[in-house]
Swiss-Prot record:
The gene is btgC. It is an enzyme of class 3 (hydrolase). It comes from the Eukaryota. This is Probable glucan endo-1,3-beta-glucosidase btgC. Glucanases play a role in cell expansion during growth, in cell-cell fusion during mating, and in spore release during sporulation. This enzyme may be involved in beta-glucan degradation. Active on laminarin and lichenan. Glycans are attached at residues 405, 428, 456, 632.
Length: 685
């Protein structure tokens, strides 16, 4: 983290006092809340929209998720790569038990990228464009939580694309408020062991027993819908995913930069701090985030009706063939799953039964002890981007997120970092994270509050109002490191960056004024692509938070650490010269699989060129980056801890990495072959 412990200097006054030591111990008995955090039943009585919001004037922001793919490429422009955090075919990629929010997370990216008033329906008006999902970079949290321009996508045709959607506020109760916190968590002494084929919403690794397996938050009795109606989803992207604007000019969004840092020249200097192979002329385009912005064809687009008896004949013939094959495969799968079901009783625990079996999980719970004692996890990350599962509107009103699952996530996160970054305030996600920290008695854990900002004034006002409520309900606000108002709002503004920036700054000013009135001594910031930061935005923020993803620059894993350091130091660090403002890399990471990216507007000619997604490459980047960053005091957030399987829908033929950015799979298991450096025992503050 940026602070007095750096072994080098940026030659600017950005080295403020370190903040690790000013973390007040969490009162395990009293908790952080003046009042108990909201708690909810398994199923909210709200089955329809609480209200229909009218359109508000275009604000310059594109409604989108907090993460999406953005290209850091050799040429100017945005890459068409998209990032989904983790999706596994055949697994519960959409349910509340999956990391990132399942189907509820899908609503974020999809809903925000279209000119409709609500839900995934927006995808129907994209003129065939594939809009990438992103969390913080595109997508994250997050998540997601990073999305590149969709393949073949042109610029947005009209201001209609900026039109806000119907949304639901944080003031809407999620189920019965009096329900015990643990009641939301799927149950069983072991995490969900349901068959992966029981429901499309079952979590990855559901057949594996143990504390790293995600539980299904809903029973097989029909608590969770097997078919989602896109018309019922109105999402604002606060999970870190955002739609990526098409057609941004290469000249305005990507500029060639020297590769001195990537080289780690023998002469030393700032760039010599990160030793890696030289990357030639890397340029920066949009970087994929953690959101639903991932550019890909909408699953909701209806096929054009076919004509002709011959075509119908072929269809009927193929259908019969599929039925025969399906019967054979179904028999085999059924037998296998039947055996597994016999081996694992109590496979369909609901959230309420989890509470009955496990109560409100805490540090003394057996499965939590297992999660918090993994020798392969090391606390070497200054911060981690995180979006709880199932925190998207309005689906969370009917299917509330699970407190116990958040507690499990935080237990794992505590082995990696002392700082967690959130992307929004909807669905009581902040309260659940704080509750988990209290239950686990994590004295040093801190939280960066997140506020999602898009083109819908109602959404923005709701998010900010909930931010204020969280602060009012928190006894000891020293647990917070600050508030991040907006993630990649300028990136999502497309060509209307000027008006978007003006409105974003006005929201930041409003929050800052409120904090002054309440005597909250907390910094206000926003996060965006590294090359979207200019002096006027720096003036309005207390920190410069840049999303920097080497994978989308088309550089090799060996060049990645140097490229990241170089880009950040040449584009963002100089902006704070002569001030006491810190610079933070708000998102950086590498996918564990799914193809390769050769930079903005560059198509890879083979599968080994450019940035290759893979475990070996991920290990290479972490080996070069993590310990050196820890040693020289670089403050950054890693994207991300857990895969988000539901994002598989945003993968394309050549870009299948959207669901694979986590250090761990959706079941909280470290990916096979992945090695987190221990940095000689040194840990992040």
């Amino acid at each position: 983290m940026s602070g007095p412990h750096r072994s080098f200097s940026f030659n600017q006054g950005d080295d403020g006092a370190g903040d690790a030591g000013d973390v007040s111990p969490i009162r395990s008995q009293e908790g952080h809340f003046m009042n108990s955090p909201p708690r909810h039943n398994d199923v909210s009585p709200v089955s329809a929209r609480s209200q229909a919001m009218g359109s508000s004037p275009s604000s310059g922001f594109l409604s989108a998720h907090e993460h999406g793919d953005r290209g850091w490429g050799q040429n100017s422009g945005h890459t068409q790569a998209m990032r989904t955090n983790s999706t596994t075919p055949g697994m519960d990629n959409l349910g509340p038990a999956a990391v990132g929010g399942g189907i509820s997370g899908i609503a974020l990216g999809v809903a925000n990228s279209h000119n409709r008033q609500s839900g995934i329906d927006a995808f129907r008006d994209t003129d065939g464009r594939n809009l990438p999902a992103e969390r913080g970079y595109n997508t994250t949290g997050s998540d997601n939580p990073y999305v590149p321009t969709p393949p073949g996508g042109g610029s947005h045709g009209s201001a209609e694309n900026l039109r806000p959607r119907d949304s639901y506020g944080s003031n809407v109760a999620l189920g019965a408020a009096a329900a015990p916190a643990g009641q939301l968590t799927p149950g069983g002494s072991n995490p969900s062991q349901r068959s992966l084929f029981d429901s499309p919403y079952q979590g990855v690794g559901a057949m594996d027993a143990g504390p790293y397996q995600r539980q299904s938050a809903y029973s097989a009795a029909g608590d969770y819908p097997l078919v989602i109606n896109p018309d019922e989803i109105a999402d604002d992207g606060d999970d870190g995913f955002t739609p990526v604007p098409n057609g941004k000019s290469a000249s305005s969004n990507a500029r060639a930069i020297p590769a001195a840092a990537a080289g780690g020249a023998a002469g030393g200097g700032l760039f010599g701090l990160f030793k890696s192979k030289k990357a030639d002329n890397p340029s920066y385009g949009p970087v994929p985030g953690a959101g639903l912005e991932a550019g890909e064809k909408s699953r909701w687009v209806k096929p054009t009706p076919g004509g002709g008896s011959r075509k119908r004949g072929w269809i009927v013939g193929l259908a019969l063939a599929f039925i025969v094959v399906g019967a054979i495969v179904g028999g085999a799968v059924g037998g296998t799953l039947g055996n597994r079901e016999n081996e694992a009783p109590d496979t369909t625990k609901s959230a309420s039964s989890d509470t009955e079996s496990n109560g409100d999980l805490n540090k003394d719970s057996s499965e939590i002890k297992d999660l918090m004692n993994n020798p392969d996890l090391h606390k070497v990350f200054p911060g981690m981007d995180y979006t709880p599962w199932g925190v998207q509107y309005p689906l969370c009103l009917k299917y509330p997120p699970s407190q116990n699952n958040v507690t499990r996530d935080v237990a794992v996160l505590s082995q990696l970092t002392n700082t967690v970054r959130l992307y929004g305030t909807d669905c009581n996600q902040t309260e659940m994270v704080l509750h988990a920290i209290d239950r686990l008695e994590l004295k040093d854990m801190k939280v960066w509050l997140g506020v999602w900002i898009d083109s819908n004034d109602t959404t923005n006002d709701r998010q900010i109002k909930q931010l204020y409520k969280v602060l009012d309900d928190t006894k000891d606000i020293s647990i917070f490191k600050g508030a991040i108002v907006g993630n990649e709002a300028l990136y999502r503004a497309g060509n209307d960056i000027a008006s978007a920036k003006k409105k974003l700054i006005s929201y930041m000013d409003d929050v800052r004024n409120h904090f002054k009135e309440k005597n909250y001594d907390l910094p206000i910031a926003t996060s965006d692509l590294g090359d979207n930061w200019k002096e006027d935005l720096v003036t309005a923020t207390d920190l410069v938070m840049s999303n920097v993803h080497p994978f989308f620059a088309g550089v090799t894993a060996k060049e990645a650490a140097g490229w990241t350091w170089n880009f950040w130091n040449q584009n963002d660090v100089p902006l704070t010269k002569g001030t006491n403002k810190k610079q933070v890399i708000s998102e950086v990471g590498w996918p564990s699989g799914g193809g390769n990216d050769c930079g903005s507007n560059n198509k890879c000619t083979d599968d080994t060129s450019g940035s290759v997604a893979g475990i070996d490459e991920m290990n290479q980047f972490m080996s070069d980056w993590i310990c050196q960053a820890l040693e020289n005091g670089t403050d950054y957030f890693w994207f991300e801890a857990f895969d988000e399987p539901w994002k598989v829908q945003y993968n394309t033929k050549d870009e299948n990495w959207e669901d694979k950015w986590g250090l761990m799979d959706a079941a909280r298991k470290l990916k096979p072959g992945l090695k987190i450096p221990d940095c000689g025992g040194k840990t992040a503050a």
